[in-house]
Amino acid sequence: MLRRLSPIQPDSFEFTPANLEWARAQMTKYPEGRQQSAIIPVLWRAQEQEGWLSRPAIEYCADLLGMPYIRALEVATFYFMFQLQPVGSVAHIQICGTTTCMICGAEDLIRVCKEKIAPEPHALSADGRFSWEEVECLGACTNAPMAQIGKDFYEDLTVEKLAALIDRFAAGEVPVPGPQNGRFSAEALGGPTALADLKGGEAHNASVARALRLGDSIKRIDGTEVPITTPWLATQNGV
């Protein structure tokens, strides 16, 4: 699939001071002269800051890493996780359309997106707050059909559940991610058939619990949310 940059581009891009510090910390993971190896996390951080990857953002990251613009552009256009056009200011919804989800109703979820957001993928809703696209397998096949919204998975969806999620996002809420039908993690719908007497007591699986604890879900990253740690420097610095 041919991927092109959006014809709508901002005049410039630069990291916030905190995100610039974060990006430079990523560069220290690699030997001197190999800083270009940090291109994926640095591009990802730029996308988290702005919501999508503009040409100025790609070129800024290339300059930061000392690499030709075309090399950074090759990476940005190769990986579908990079959004090359503006996305909804509240949420970008990615509907899994691969086999299991398709069999379980992904086409119906896509119809909801067309009706409530925009008729075409990657187009913004009338108020600019939402966008959507169909993507390949997101790896939650047991809990099909599902969607990724921001950083989180919303699983075991129905037409009604997805429509309600969109309405809640529009109202300023951030619904709890994970299964939307009461299932714990990826257990069988009828409940566990082995180790049935093992009572964990957790309300959510580890990834959902972490998302709730950090409060880092669909919001943009300004650099203050995630601590900058460089444990790989401890040994070489003698700390």
Curated annotation (Swiss-Prot):
EC annotation from Swiss-Prot or TrEMBL: 7.1.1.-
PANTHER family xref list: NADH DEHYDROGENASE [UBIQUINONE] FLAVOPROTEIN 2, MITOCHONDRIAL, NADH DEHYDROGENASE UBIQUINONE FLAVOPROTEIN 2, MITOCHONDRIAL
Pfam families xrefs: 2Fe-2S_thioredx
Catalytic activity of the protein: a quinone + NADH + 5 H(+)(in) = a quinol + NAD(+) + 4 H(+)(out)
Cofactor note: Binds 1 [2Fe-2S] cluster.
SUPFAM superfamilies in the record: Thioredoxin-like
Positions of [2Fe-2S] cluster binding: C96, C101, C137, C141
Chief location category: membrane
Function according to Swiss-Prot or TrEMBL: NDH-1 shuttles electrons from NADH, via FMN and iron-sulfur (Fe-S) centers, to quinones in the respiratory chain. The immediate electron acceptor for the enzyme in this species is believed to be ubiquinone. Couples the redox reaction to proton translocation (for every two electrons transferred, four hydrogen ions are translocated across the cytoplasmic membrane), and thus conserves the redox energy in a proton gradient.
Assigned keywords, A-Z: 2Fe-2S, Cell inner membrane, Cell membrane, Iron, Iron-sulfur, Membrane, Metal-binding, NAD, Quinone, Translocase, Ubiquinone
UniProt cross-references to PROSITE patterns, sorted A to Z: COMPLEX1_24K
Gene Ontology molecular-function annotations: 2 iron, 2 sulfur cluster binding; metal ion binding; NADH dehydrogenase activity; quinone binding
Keyword RNA-binding: no
Result for mutant: C141 to A/S: Alters UV-visible and EPR spectra
A GO cellular-component term linked to this record: plasma membrane
Similarity annotation: Belongs to the complex I 24 kDa subunit family.
Protein name as catalogued: NADH-quinone oxidoreductase chain 2
Naturally occurring in which organism (per UniProt): Paracoccus denitrificans
Signal sequence extent: none
Topology in the lipid bilayer: Peripheral membrane protein
Keyword Transmembrane helix included in the entry's annotation: no
Listed cofactors: [2Fe-2S] cluster
Localization of this protein: Cell inner membrane
Subunit relationships: NDH-1 is composed of at least 14 different subunits, Nqo1 to Nqo14. The complex has a L-shaped structure, with the hydrophobic arm (subunits Nqo7, Nqo8, Nqo10 to Nqo14) embedded in the inner membrane and the hydrophilic peripheral arm (subunits Nqo1 to Nqo6, Nqo9) protruding into the bacterial cytoplasm. The hydrophilic domain contains all the redox centers.
